[in-house]
Amino acid sequence: MPPRFDVLIPFLEHLGLRLLEIGGGRARVGFDPKPEHLNSWKAIHGGGVMTVLDAALSSACRSLDEGCIGATTVELKVNFIAAARGPVIAEGRAQRAGRSLLFAEGELRDGAGAVLAKATGTFKLVYPQARGE
C-alpha cells in the first residue's frame, strides 16, 4: 500500500493526489488529471501544477520532523517549462532547515521523465497545540 499524507487534506483528496513516497527530506506525489483539471489547451491548469508541486515540497519538509502535523507554505515559486499533459509526478526535496523555516525545491515530470515545471518554496512546520504553537 502506498504511503498516505497522514493528515486529512480535503483539497488534495478532491484532486486525487497520491503520495507515492515520503521520507528523509524527500517526497513524490502523483496526479492523474481529469478533464476538469485542464485549461483550454488540454493541459493541466497552472494552479493544478502548482498544487502538485506544493504538496510534494511541503511533504518533503514535513518528513524531517515526525512531531509536526503539517507544513504551511510561506512562499512558492514555479517556473513553467512545458505543458503538463497526462499523468505527472512531482518530486520535492528539503534543502535547508533554518530555526523556524525550511527551504525546498522540486520538479514536475511527465511519464517519460521530461521536466515540465520547477519549483522552490519556503515552509513552516506546524505542531499540535500541546507543543505551544
Per-range role (PLM):
Residues M1-E133:
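Terminal targeting signals and extreme-terminal segments of soluble enzymes
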